[in-house]
């Protein structure tokens, strides 16, 4: 319903998450216009790129245990900020290092940090959407979130393809760095839902 969508679009705590998922997937797709060429430049044929991607992805999944531990300690805001900051740091490092033809170990480390950031943010944001959205508009909130995720995938591919033709890899990495920095600045004030630990005493006082 139109009213529920308005509640979602105008909600003071949801727009940062919606912006975030759009930026995350825009950066992901645009970045991947550049990364394969950097790996080839570093001496790794395209058919062997999985030798870098697979270990980086698997190692990043091992880091998710820290996310769940941090959530139990009520440190979810720190996890979210760390993920966004790490995403920005990776884009900035690629921007600075790409003209110098970074080696495979450097690229592998940057991809590991990227996947750590990506997995942290992918695991954190949908949970925050469902917990911060008004109960009557939770479905609409998740629908808007998923729509912006899809739009980010499209925008990243289109933007990356256009920029690499117009200005080369550096233009793509400037754009991804600016987007990640914008998200970091705007997302720094993201409100967190009350933790279960803090909610319990409040409920007890109510009785």
Region locations from a protein language model:
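Juxtamembrane intracellular "pre-TM" segments in multi-pass secondary transporters
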Residues: 1-20, 204-207
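Pair of pore-lining "gating" transmembrane helices in MFS-fold secondary transporters
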Residues: 11-31, 112
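Short amphipathic helix-loop junctions that connect adjacent transmembrane helices
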Residues: 33-49
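Loop-to-transmembrane helix entry/capping segments in MFS-fold secondary transporters
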Residues: 46, 135-145
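Helix-to-loop junctions at the C-terminal end of transmembrane segments
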Residues: 62-77, 164
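C-terminal transmembrane helical hairpin of 12-TM major facilitator-type secondary transporters
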Residues: 78-125
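A membrane-interface helix-boundary motif in multi-pass transporters
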Residues: 162-180
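Multi-pass alpha-helical transporter architecture, strongest
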Residues: 176-207
């Amino acid at each position: 319903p139109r009213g529920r969508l308005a509640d979602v679009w105008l909600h003071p705590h949801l727009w940062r998450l919606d912006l975030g998922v759009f930026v995350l997937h825009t950066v992901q797709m645009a970045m991947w216009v550049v990364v394969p060429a950097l790996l080839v430049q570093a001496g790794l044929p395209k058919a062997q790129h999985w030798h870098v991607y697979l270990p980086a992805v698997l190692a990043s999944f091992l880091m998710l245990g820290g996310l769940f531990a941090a959530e139990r300690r009520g440190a979810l805001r720190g996890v979210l900020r760390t993920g966004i900051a790490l995403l920005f740091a990776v884009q900035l490092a690629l921007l600075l290092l790409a003209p110098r033809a970074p080696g495979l170990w450097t690229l592998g480390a940057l991809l590991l940090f990227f996947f750590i950031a990506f997995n942290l943010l992918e695991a954190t944001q949908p949970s925050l959407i469902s917990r911060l959205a008004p109960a009557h508009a939770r479905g609409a909130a998740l629908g808007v979130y998923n729509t912006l995720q899809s739009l980010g995938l499209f925008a990243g591919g289109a933007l990356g393809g256009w920029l690499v033709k117009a200005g080369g890899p550096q233009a793509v990495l400037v754009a991804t760095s600016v987007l990640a920095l914008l998200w970091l600045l705007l997302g720094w004030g993201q409100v967190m839902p009350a933790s279960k630990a803090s909610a319990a005493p409040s409920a007890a006082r109510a009785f």
